[in-house]
Curated annotation (Swiss-Prot):
Stretches the record annotates as Disordered: 91-122
Source lineage: Eukaryota, Metazoa, Chordata, Craniata, Vertebrata
GO biological process: acute-phase response; cholesterol metabolic process; response to bacterium
Gene: Saa1
Record's keyword annotation contains Secreted: yes
Protein name per the record: Serum amyloid A-1 protein
Region annotated Important for amyloid formation, chain positions: 20-45
Main location: secreted
Length: 122
């Protein structure tokens, strides 16, 4: 637990060095909201083969907020994938999800993963 706390603190510290503390925290909260919106949209759409698109879109939207959004997207994505892999989800699917996450966080177009026919609402 001490190691995890130290890692989170160091990650926050590194992110804060890039800008003000309150700005970083604000961006992180907004980025977490972007990730949540992508998740709820994915559940609402219930569209076959859309998982990677929503991963990329959530990370992309969060990263557009700034360093705090990037940090939040990375921690949320890594945590979600670690949790799912721990409970037996396929390793190959986890790798593909992480690639979509990195794609979005790097600022690349999330529509690269958009499945055909997904309604324009998303």
């Amino acid at each position: 637990m001490k190691l995890l706390t130290s890692l989170v603190f160091c990650s926050l510290l590194l992110g804060v060095c890039h800008g003000g503390f309150f700005s970083f925290v604000h961006e992180a909260f907004q980025g977490a909201g972007d990730m949540w919106r992508a998740y709820t949209d994915m559940k609402e759409a219930n569209w076959k083969n859309s998982d990677k698109y929503f991963h990329a879109r959530g990370n992309y939207d969060a990263a557009q907020r700034g360093p705090g959004g990037v940090w939040a997207a990375e921690k949320i994505s890594d945590g979600r994938e670690a949790f799912q892999e721990f409970f037996g989800r396929g390793h190959e699917d986890t790798i593909a999800d992480q690639e979509a996450n990195r794609h979005g966080r790097s600022g690349k177009d999330p529509n690269y993963y958009r499945p055909p026919g997904l309604p324009d609402k998303y």
